[in-house]
């Protein structure tokens, strides 16, 4: 998962040492903020740890401004490497804002010079080699590893004056100021002679610092390992990793070590080194093809005698170098991992690794140096463990969590080799004692400086020794907190095992329940299909019956229309006959007597029965249609009522689902609707009105008509179904269409809700 700005901010704060972290909080309180931002209350920051402080920064200022503010404070407190790492981690899009917020506080990497120029030896002293010496060291060209070109191309002039000899001899310093940019200038030979050794040491220190930066040196924590120091005759300290073994002309061993030089071409793409030995002195010159005059540096023989036989200019990466003899007996170097032996780094843009190994001397792990961290002043000495500078606020306080020196205090072999490690180890031993002191353990809130060493079983809380003697815990079961913790851990383990077993049991039953649920769902789907198919068929049947019934009604309407047209035709013929006889009556005698017999015959043939006669078949069709419509109406009503009652659940069904027996009131209270199906052919003889019994404790149903009292009410019969759970009464009323003496009750069939057997031949006697 990608890290956010808050994650990078928290990682940076966690990498700060305790003293640096307190210094960071102090600087944060005194830093001016942008408009619209308020300072974090001092009470919140006093006891805040990195996690709490990161959350306060994000809460008060937001992620982006919190990162910019952190970069500003880190640079102000000389934590340049952490600031650079945070800037790279948060991306380059904040670079412009960082420069605007930080103001004059800029990264040390951006302020470093394009190259390190070492003053060359004057032409009269070091540019000419001694012709009497035949074993002059050959110059070799070092391969320069291609590092990331992240340095600024601009060079800035240093505002400080020349460094003193003491400040130049401080090795592995963390510089906060940009490197010097050498300009053209003249210097007397005497001054050059006196400061040559110091200048070489200072430039070698700068080269080693840049080497660690450009060769992917480890992080800040790894760069704080111990550095082995040696004392020079002048009383100054020097890291052993910066020592270069040199020999005079008389005492030079057969396999003399080479100090190669690099010379850059005029286009600035190649750097070379060259070394010359003149009059028992070794002069290392760095030349750069820019046309700018360069100063010289001379190392005297006395200084070289006090140096060790090894040199390491990179922090933790060792460059194994194997030496082979060529045909002339001079040493040759075999380069490994793109690094070449050398003594001085001439260009910070192109890192150079130098690892020298004597032919007959085994490697000593203590001689491997650690690359100094960037961000401190170049002219001040730094403790290899705690990185404390001279004049720092901490003084002699060592804040390193562990000492990386392998030499224990009091070791006779350590005399003259690593004196500063004794001080660090003493401070670390004191810090170890403080870590094991009672103050690091939880203290009693009631009794100050009393550690909670006991545990009260009755109150289930940790207590101190004074609490144990108090009246509150008198007579209670008290044990050491370690024993109680072991017992409770065992109880927690047992509960975890029990809960895990329970979880497995529940999971197993859940799987079984899921299987049963799937079966129920399948059965439900099957029942749905079983019900849907008959209902669909019934719906299709009803549609066909509806079409048939509508067709019959249309035919009947057409028949009635024909009867009416026939009646109108006969009436019109009668009117014509009347008009013809009236006209015949007003004619003269001679005209009247013509066709008089035919006219009278036609008049006599007209009769009322012929005019009012209905066409044959119409009456039968009307009667049959009436019967069918009445039957359909009754059957549809019965079917709808029966379907509604079948879909309703009784109290006994609900009680059966809940696993209990229904009460008598519930059984008698829910009486389903009773249905009676009559033959459609006899609907004219009698009309049956059927009413359900009133529900117990409820009102009479409103969906049915009230019983209509009849003159001759038949006897009341109670009918019970097979399961003897339903009881109902029926009231029947007849509407005879003929004489009372001919009343007859046709055979009717009763059908119960639960498909009980039909009860035919229910004959009701009349009073």
Curated annotation (Swiss-Prot):
Post-translational modification: Phosphorylation at Ser-241 is required for the interaction with 14-3-3 proteins and down-regulation of pyrin pro-inflammatory activity. Degraded along with the delivery of its substrates to autolysosomal compartments (at protein level).
Keywords (A to Z) from UniProt: Actin-binding, Cell projection, Coiled coil, Cytoplasm, Cytoplasmic vesicle, Cytoskeleton, Immunity, Inflammatory response, Innate immunity, Metal-binding, Microtubule, Nucleus, Phosphoprotein, Zinc, Zinc-finger
Gene it is expressed from: Mefv
Region feature Required for homotrimerization and induction of pyroptosomes, mapped onto this chain: 489-647
One CC-aspect GO term: cytoplasm
MF terms (GO), sorted A to Z: actin binding; zinc ion binding
UniProt keyword annotation of Zinc present: yes
Major place of residence: cytoplasm
The protein, known as: Pyrin
A Pfam family it matches: PYRIN
């Amino acid at each position: 998962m990608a890290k956010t700005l808050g994650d990078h901010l928290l990682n940076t704060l966690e990498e700060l040492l305790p003293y640096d972290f307190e210094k960071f909080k102090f600087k944060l309180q005194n830093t001016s903020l942008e408009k619209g931002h308020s300072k974090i209350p001092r009470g919140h920051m006093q006891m805040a740890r990195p996690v709490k402080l990161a959350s306060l920064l994000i809460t008060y200022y937001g992620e982006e401004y919190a990162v910019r503010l952190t970069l500003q404070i880190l640079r102000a407190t000389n934590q340049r490497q952490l600031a650079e790492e945070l800037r790279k981690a948060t991306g380059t899009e904040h670079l412009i804002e960082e420069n605007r917020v930080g103001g004059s506080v800029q990264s040390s990497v951006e302020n470093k010079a394009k190259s390190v120029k070492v003053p060359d030896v004057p032409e009269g002293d070091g540019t000419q080699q001694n012709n009497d010496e035949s074993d002059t060291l050959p110059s070799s060209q070092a391969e320069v590893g291609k590092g990331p070109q992240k340095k600024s191309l601009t060079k800035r002039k240093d505002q400080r004056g020349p460094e003193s000899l003491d400040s130049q001899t401080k090795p592995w310093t963390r510089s906060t100021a940009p490197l010097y940019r050498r300009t053209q200038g003249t210097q007397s030979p005497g001054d050059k002679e006196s400061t040559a050794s110091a200048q070489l040491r200072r430039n070698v220190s700068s080269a080693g610092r840049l080497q660690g930066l450009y060769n992917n040196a480890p992080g800040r924590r790894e760069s704080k390992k111990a550095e082995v120091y040696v004392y020079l005759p002048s009383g100054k300290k020097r890291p052993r990793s910066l020592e270069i073994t040199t020999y005079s002309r008389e005492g030079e061993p057969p396999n003399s070590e080479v100090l190669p030089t690099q010379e850059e071409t005029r286009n600035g793409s190649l750097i070379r080194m060259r070394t010359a030995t003149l009059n028992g002195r070794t002069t290392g010159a760095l030349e750069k093809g820019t046309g700018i005059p360069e100063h010289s540096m001379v190392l005297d023989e006395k200084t070289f005698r006090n140096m060790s036989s090894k040199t390491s200019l990179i922090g933790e990466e060792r460059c194994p170098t194997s030496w082979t003899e060529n045909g002339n007996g001079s040493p040759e170097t075999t380069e490994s991992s793109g690094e070449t032996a050398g003594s001085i780094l001439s260009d910070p843009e192109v890192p150079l690794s130098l690892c020298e190994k004597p032919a007959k001397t085994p490697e000593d792990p203590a001689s491997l140096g650690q690359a100094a961290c960037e961000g401190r002043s170049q002219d001040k000495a730094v403790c290899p463990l705690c990185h404390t500078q001279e004049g720092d606020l901490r003084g002699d306080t060592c804040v390193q969590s562990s000492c990386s020196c392998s030499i224990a205090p009091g070791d006779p072999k350590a005399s003259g080799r690593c004196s500063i490690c004794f001080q660090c180890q003493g401070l670390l031993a004191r810090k170890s004692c403080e870590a094991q002191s009672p103050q690091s353990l939880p203290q009693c809130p009631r009794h100050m400086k009393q550690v909670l060493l006991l545990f009260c079983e009755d109150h289930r809380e940790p207590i101190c020794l004074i609490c144990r003697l108090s009246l509150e815990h008198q007579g209670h079961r008290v044990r050491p907190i370690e024993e109680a913790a072991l017992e409770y851990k065992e109880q927690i383990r047992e509960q975890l095992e029990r809960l895990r077993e329970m979880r497995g049991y529940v999971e197993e039953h859940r799987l079984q329940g899921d299987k049963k649920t799937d079966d129920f769902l399948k059965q439900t789907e099957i029942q749905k299909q079983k019900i849907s198919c008959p209902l669909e068929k019934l719906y299709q049947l009803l549609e066909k019956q509806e079409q048939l019934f509508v067709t019959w009604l249309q035919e009947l309407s057409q028949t009635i229309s024909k009867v009416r047209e026939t009646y109108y035709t006969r009436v019109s013929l009668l009117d014509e006959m009347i008009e013809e006889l009236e006209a015949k009556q007003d004619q003269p005698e001679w005209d009247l007597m013509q066709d008089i017999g035919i006219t009278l015959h036609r008049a006599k043939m007209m009769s009322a029965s012929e005019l009012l006669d209905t066409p044959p078949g119409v009456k039968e069709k009307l009667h049959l249609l009436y019967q069918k419509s009445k039957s359909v109406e009754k059957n549809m009503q019965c079917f709808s009522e029966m379907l509604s009652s079948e879909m309703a659940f009784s109290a006994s069904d609900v009680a059966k689902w809940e696993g209990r027996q229904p009460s008598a009131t519930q059984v008698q209270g829910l009486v389903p609707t009773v249905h009676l199906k009559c033959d459609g052919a006899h609907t004219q003889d009698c009309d049956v009105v059927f009413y359900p019994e009133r529900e117990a404790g409820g009102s009479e149903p409103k969906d049915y008509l009230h019983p209509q009292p009849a003159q001759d009410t038949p006897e009341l019969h109670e009918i019970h179904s097979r399961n003897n759970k339903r009881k109902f009464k029926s009231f029947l009323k007849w509407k005879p269409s003929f004489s009372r003496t001919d009343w007859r009750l046709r055979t009717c069939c009763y059908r119960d809700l639960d498909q009980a057997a039909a009860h035919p031949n229910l004959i009701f006697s009349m009073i």
